[in-house]
């Protein structure tokens, strides 16, 4: 039996109420002082990392005990992550900082199923968490010889400017030209198996105005970007995306473009710079410019719609207008959402009763959730435009430079690379040779634990749906096996549907996503409207013309739902928008009859559909 050593730090956990204080997040007029207690279970004899993969903290909020569970965000940085700034004489300085043992976490509150957390544990706890439906911020109070932290609500941070802040996107621009993969990287065979997650390899660019705003403190700027990216990563996790930082560029001496308050000018200039310079220097899928200037009017962000993977337009520009990093993350997530084909939410969209990320303006309490509309629009864009650059998970093999032992990048010929002998914190790896130490089977990976392969059968990737079984360690490798799905067309949900790319699409779920609770699939007679071939009732478009459904295909056109919600009696409810004609259509792979599924507007035999 494995003995467990319980490590307890700072036993004090009593709260204290304060009326006003100045913190990094701004002037806070109501806060609570807490003393988080860290409790971590370590196997006896285990070597503790500087920042553990999993941690647990206990403290009190409003007098009630809270247990915060944290897990390191292992998808925050790519293995070839780089940072670039410039010397006073204009020389470019690029480094590959150690990122494996970073201090950024996602988490949850014990016994609160709707809770979330995005926390930096670099110097105390700093970040945000959702508890009982409310968003709280936490950060150290920077008192000498004290573990005191302040916990407060976003609404209690004084705002310098109460005017509503808006996204500048008003036009429904879409790129209908074929979007080709920018990178020449070929997927390894294991990656050709369908992966439920998409990976957006992102470069963040910080302009000279930001450097001036933060008095040239590059560490403060970097920390702000890390925390914002960690928040953003959590937001996209529920969309089945991983937003991975592959690079941070800080224009320390001068801007590489002219950054103006005119968002149209600045967005186009940044897009041109990205296309002509950045793509040649750094493999990536998307770039975001963070600026310290004030955009014209109330605009704080701007981006192209439906442009992910486009060599020029896969960009967004964001104004850093709030000291709260969660706010910056929301704007970054919002603008990237436009790149992924997502429009602004309207009155029909919802996200569990909370404000939604894709609202046209920043809500009084920044949201961490995408709406049902956003989910449908995003995946509709992916299915219809196939932006291939987001299909590959960032790997060490993406690196083009010659292998170099000690750079913390796992390259050809190396079994491990933990940095220089002075900085190496991996007990499994010989830093001088980049080979595993004697007796070690592995040095990293989801199936590696204390330098040994994890036991065969240990779960390493959870099931995401009935059509997506969990993966388990083999006992022979440090890596989790490739993610595999049940075969397309296999029955699921008690034969109500058929598996399709790891999901089980059925009309009831699609109705719920569009309209909310008390919504069901409509009677068959409602779908007869799809025979009309008019502006809303059709099966598919060919050369811009809407093709009416044949009798056997009517359940593969517009989706019809029965609304039994209070005060409603609509047996044939449907959704149509001129701005997004695809929204409200039955999704591919949906069951349309016994033994049949929708494919390109036809109801076809499931045995031949795939």
UniProtKB/Swiss-Prot annotation:
Functional note: Snake venom zinc metalloprotease that causes hemorrhage and dose-dependently inhibits platelet aggregation triggered by collagen. This inhibition is due to its binding to glycoprotein VI (GP6) and collagen. The binding to GP6 results in inhibition of the signaling pathway (decrease of tyrosine phosphorylation of signaling proteins such as Syk, LAT, PI3-K and PLCgamma2). Preferentially cleaves alpha chain (FGA) of fibrinogen, followed by beta chain (FGB). Also degrades the extracellular matrix protein fibronectin (FN1), and cleaves collagen and von Willebrand factor (VWF).
Propeptide intervals in chain numbering: 21-191
Signal peptide range in chain numbering: 1-20
Any single Pfam family the record assigns to this protein: Reprolysin
Disulfide bonds: 309-389, 349-373, 351-356, 405-434, 416-429, 418-424, 428-451, 442-448, 447-473, 460-480, 467-499, 492-504, 511-561, 526-572, 539-549, 556-598, 592-603
UniProt organism field: Deinagkistrodon acutus (Hundred-pace snake)
Protein name as catalogued: Zinc metalloproteinase-disintegrin-like acurhagin
Binding site for Ca(2+) 3: 468-469, 471, 483-484
Residues at the catalytic site: 335
Start and end residues of each Peptidase M12B domain: 198-394
Activity: how regulated: The proteinase activity is slightly enhanced by Ca(2+) and Mg(2+), but is completely inhibited by Zn(2+). Is completely inhibited by phenanthroline and EDTA. Not inhibited by PMSF.
Tissue: Expressed by the venom gland.
Subunit structure: Monomer.
InterPro entries registered for this protein in UniProt: ADAM_Cys-rich, Disintegrin_CS, Disintegrin_dom, Disintegrin_dom_sf, MetalloPept_cat_dom_sf, Peptidase_M12B, Peptidase_M12B_N, Reprolysin_adamalysin
PTM text: N-glycosylated.
């Amino acid at each position: 039996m494995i003995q467990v050593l319980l490590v307890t730090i700072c036993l004090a956990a009593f709260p204290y109420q304060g009326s006003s204080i100045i913190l990094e997040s701004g002037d806070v007029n109501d806060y609570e002082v807490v003393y988080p207690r860290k409790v971590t279970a370590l196997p006896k004899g285990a070597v503790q990392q500087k920042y553990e993969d999993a941690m647990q903290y206990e403290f009190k909020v409003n007098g009630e005990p809270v247990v915060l569970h944290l897990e390191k965000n292992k998808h925050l940085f790519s293995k070839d992550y780089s940072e670039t700034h410039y010397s006073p004489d204009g020389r470019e300085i690029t480094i590959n900082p150690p990122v494996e043992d970073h201090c950024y976490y996602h988490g949850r509150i014990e016994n609160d199923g709707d809770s979330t957390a995005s926390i930096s544990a670099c110097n105390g706890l700093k970040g945000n968490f959702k508890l009982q439906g409310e968003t709280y911020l936490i950060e150290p109070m920077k008192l000498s010889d004290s573990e005191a932290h302040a916990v407060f609500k976003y609404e209690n941070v004084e705002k310098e400017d109460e005017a509503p802040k808006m996204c500048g996107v008003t036009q429904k621009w879409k790129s209908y030209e074929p979007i080709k993969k920018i990178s020449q990287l070929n997927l390894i065979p294991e990656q050709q198996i369908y992966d439920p997650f998409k990976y957006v390899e992102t470069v963040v660019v910080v302009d000279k105005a930001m450097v001036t705003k933060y008095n040239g403190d590059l560490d403060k700027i970097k920390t702000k970007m890390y925390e914002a990216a960690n928040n953003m990563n959590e937001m996209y996790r529920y969309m089945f995306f991983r937003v991975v930082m592959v690079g941070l560029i800080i224009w320390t001496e001068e801007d590489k473009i002219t950054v103006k308050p005119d968002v149209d000018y600045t967005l186009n200039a940044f897009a041109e710079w990205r296309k002509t310079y950045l793509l040649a220097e750094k493999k990536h899928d998307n770039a975001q410019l963070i600026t310290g200037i004030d955009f014209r009017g109330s605009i704080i962000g701007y981006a192209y719609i439906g442009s992910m993977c486009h060599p020029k337009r896969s960009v967004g520009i964001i104004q850093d207008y709030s000291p709260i990093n969660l706010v910056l993350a929301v704007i970054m997530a919002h603008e990237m959402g436009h790149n992924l084909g997502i429009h602004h939410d309207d009155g029909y969209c919802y996200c569990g009763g909370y404000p939604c990320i894709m609202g046209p303006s920043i809500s009084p309490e920044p949201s961490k959730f995408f709406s049902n509309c956003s989910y449908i629009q995003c995946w509709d864009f992916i299915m219809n435009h196939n932006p291939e650059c987001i299909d590959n998970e960032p790997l060490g093999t993406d690196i083009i430079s010659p292998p170099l032992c000690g750079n913390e990048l796992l390259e050809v010929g190396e079994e491990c690379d933990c940095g220089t002998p002075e900085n190496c914190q991996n007990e499994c790896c010989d830093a001088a040779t980049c080979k595993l130490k004697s007796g070690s089977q592995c040095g990293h990976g989801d199936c590696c634990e204390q330098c040994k392969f994890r036991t065969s059968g240990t779960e390493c990737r959870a099931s995401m749906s009935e059509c997506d079984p969990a993966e388990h360690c083999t006992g022979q490798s440090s890596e989790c096996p490739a993610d595999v799905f049940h075969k397309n067309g296999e029955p699921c949900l008690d034969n109500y549907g058929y598996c399709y790319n790891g999901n089980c699409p059925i009309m009831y779920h699609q109705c719920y996503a569009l309209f909310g609770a008390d919504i069901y699939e409509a009677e068959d007679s409602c779908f007869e409207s799809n025979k009309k071939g008019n502006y809303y009732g059709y099966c598919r478009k060919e050369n811009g013309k809407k093709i009416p459904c044949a009798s056997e295909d009517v359940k593969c056109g517009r989706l019809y739902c029965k609304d039994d919600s209070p005060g409603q009696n609509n047996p044939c409810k449907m959704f149509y928008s001129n701005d997004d004609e695809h929204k409200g259509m039955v999704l591919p792979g949906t069951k349309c009859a016994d033994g049949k599924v929708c494919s390109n507007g036809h109801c076809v035999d499931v045995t031949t559909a795939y």
